[in-house]
């Protein structure tokens, strides 16, 4: 251990000096320095995960404050559009510039967006702030994993990946509780202001403790740097993603799917995304997504797996609380408490699997086994009825959440394992792009199924207009009908929610198929290879090596 809190790495076997092209060994931070860096990263990750759910219970007060009922959809969509659209561009930026400064820039953008939201004088300013915060989040989300990639040895990363899974599950579940606490006791503006001091703490810890080698752009002319960012590809990708998400957000709710606006958006999205694929095939390694990375077996399977597991996670995370509120007459706060079996089980499974993978090295068995548990648990959750008692809704949650916790984080670990270090930021960004896009698409699918099935099931109840179903919260549905129709009302809500849960069953089964295509790679193999080995410190594709991320070679 040296005086800087980093571990000194030994030279090649036999005590020989590092040979030509091997480069010096990398020094990973240890002890207090490492823990400080990871704390900063976890705080930033917590904020981005929290920001996606904390606003849910605050929206009614915001719309009352600004008299902006027509803008409700934009409070979530503005954040989501920039969050998804810029994920892959940030991956390219991380692969070319020093991740420390890219990450800090993303945190600063997120903080600016949060400050604008908190101080917003009108609804338009709030929407702009949400879009800026989403842009910052797109760099934080994958950036925290990319920095972990450069600060933690591969064989130890499963532990930190497991902790990240706990953070994500906790933030996603407690967001509505925190939002409700601020909204009811202080002000909805504190749903955004809380990000400022926590984000500042992240900035301080990363500034003080994270030190990375010089960026690959050193000595590269500015024009060449801009060309490395694939401007043509991103001019196709970013508008294409925005058009796709707008069509998904508006289709079936604001406008009919056959409406000219939706059709035009879908056609434009298709044309732009096809053009993006063409640009990537033309540019090859100089593109935003090198085709060889996309064709890597574990990356392709990992993206499919991530889309499917996120679909199930979002379905239950959003609609299971609605079941508790509508069917079990739970308050918003109490429904959050009733979700604790999911939070605790997924967190424990994620952390335990991290330690086990650290010991045994293989992550693929946990993806396969976790997918099977998810499929079984999701299937059992579709058996809920208005009379289902707590032993079942607790036990079925636990079974599904254990599978989710076992498997959800492993695709990003696979990207770090199978790719050489120059490609790792791109691979990690692809996984997180799949997560954000999959969640967005399937939430829209769930919402369409839920709304249509609810209207079909409850349309025959006397004196129950369609507007009452869409404008009444789940906690107040019992006030919509006379007592003699309450059973039909609850049965209709239950049936509509079970149809949504069946989407999660299908996606969980698809996870099993995707996981079966993952390669069986051992994260401990890189440790055994030692410094100078392929992908290892000082070796080809490794930090300090001739083809490493910091090596200065052109892409």
Curated annotation (Swiss-Prot):
Main location: endoplasmic reticulum
Pfam families, per database record: MFS_1
Biased composition (Gly residues): 530-555
Transmembrane regions listed in the UniProt entry: 30-50, 71-91, 101-121, 132-152, 162-182, 190-210, 232-252, 262-282, 304-324, 337-357, 364-384, 393-413, 425-445, 497-517
Recorded phenotype for the gene knockout or disruption: Does not affect the production of viriditoxin but leads to a sporulation defect.
One GO MF term: transmembrane transporter activity
Membrane topology per record: Multi-pass membrane protein
Keyword Ubl conjugation attributed: no
Domain of life of the organism encoding this protein: Eukaryota
Subcellular location(s) of the protein: Endoplasmic reticulum membrane
Glycan attachment sites: 4, 122, 185, 329
Keyword annotations: Endoplasmic reticulum, Glycoprotein, Membrane, Transmembrane, Transmembrane helix
Family the UniProt entry places it in: Belongs to the major facilitator superfamily. TCR/Tet family.
Protein role: MFS-type transporter; part of the gene cluster that mediates the biosynthesis of viriditoxin, one of the 'classical' secondary metabolites produced by fungi and that has antibacterial activity. Is not essential for viriditoxin production.
Protein name: MFS-type transporter VdtG
Native organism: Byssochlamys spectabilis (Paecilomyces variotii)
């Amino acid at each position: 251990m040296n005086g800087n809190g980093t571990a000194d790495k030994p030279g090649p076997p036999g005590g020989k000096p590092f040979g030509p092209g091997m480069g010096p060994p990398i020094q990973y931070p240890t002890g207090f320095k490492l823990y400080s860096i990871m704390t900063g990263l976890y705080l930033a990750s917590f904020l981005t995960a929290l920001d996606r759910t904390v606003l849910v219970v605050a929206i009614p007060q915001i719309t009352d404050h600004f008299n902006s009922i027509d803008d409700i959809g934009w409070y979530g969509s503005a954040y989501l559009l920039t969050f998804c659209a810029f994920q892959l561009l940030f991956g390219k930026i991380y692969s070319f510039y020093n991740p420390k400064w890219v990450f800090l820039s993303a945190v600063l953008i997120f903080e600016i967006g949060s400050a604008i939201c908190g101080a917003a004088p009108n609804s338009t300013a709030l929407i702009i702030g949400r879009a800026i915060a989403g842009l910052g989040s797109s760099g934080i989300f994958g950036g925290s994993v990319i920095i972990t990639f450069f600060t933690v040895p591969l064989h130890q990363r499963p532990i930190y990946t497991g902790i990240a899974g706990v953070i994500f599950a906790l933030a996603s579940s407690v967001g509505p509780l925190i939002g409700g606490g601020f909204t009811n006791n202080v002000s909805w503006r504190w749903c955004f202001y809380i990000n400022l001091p926590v984000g500042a703490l992240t900035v301080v810890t990363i500034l003080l403790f994270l030190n990375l080698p010089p960026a690959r752009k050193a000595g590269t002319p500015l024009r060449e740097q801009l060309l490395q960012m694939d401007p043509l590809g991103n001019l196709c990708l970013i508008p294409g993603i925005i058009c796709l998400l707008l069509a998904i957000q508006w289709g079936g709710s604001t406008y009919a799917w056959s409406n000219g606006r939706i059709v035009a958006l879908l056609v434009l999205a298709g044309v732009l995304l096809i053009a993006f694929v063409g640009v990537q095939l033309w540019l090859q390694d100089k593109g935003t997504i090198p085709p060889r990375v996309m064709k890597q077996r574990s990356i392709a399977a990992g993206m499919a797996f991530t889309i499917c597991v996120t679909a199930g996670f979002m379905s239950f995370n959003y609609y299971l609380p609605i079941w508790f509120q509508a069917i079990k007459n739970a308050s918003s706060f109490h429904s959050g408490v009733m979700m604790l079996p999911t939070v605790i089980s997924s967190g424990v499974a994620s952390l335990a699997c991290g330690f086990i993978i650290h010991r045994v090295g293989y992550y693929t068995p946990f993806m396969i086994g976790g997918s099977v548990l998810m499929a079984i648990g999701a299937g059992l959750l579709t058996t809920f009825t208005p009379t289902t008692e707590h032993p079942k809704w607790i036990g079925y949650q636990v079974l599904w959440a254990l599978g989710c916790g076992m498997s959800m984080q492993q695709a990003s670990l696979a990207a770090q394992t199978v790719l050489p270090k120059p490609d790792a930021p791109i691979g990690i960004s692809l996984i997180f792009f799949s997560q954000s896009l999959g969640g967005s698409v399937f939430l829209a699918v769930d919402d369409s199924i839920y709304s249509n099935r609810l209207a079909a099931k409850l349309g025959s109840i006397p004196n129950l207009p369609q507007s009452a179903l869409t404008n009444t919260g789940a906690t107040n549905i019992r006030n919509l009908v006379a007592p003699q129709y309450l059973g039909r009302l609850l049965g209709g809500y239950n049936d509509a929610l079970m149809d949504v849960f069946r989407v999660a069953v299908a996606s969980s089964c698809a996870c099993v198929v995707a996981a079966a295509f993952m390669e069986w790679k051992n994260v401990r193999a890189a440790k055994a290879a030692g410094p100078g080995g392929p992908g290892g410190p000082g070796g080809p594709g490794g930090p300090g090596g001739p083809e490493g991320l910091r090596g200065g070679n052109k892409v």
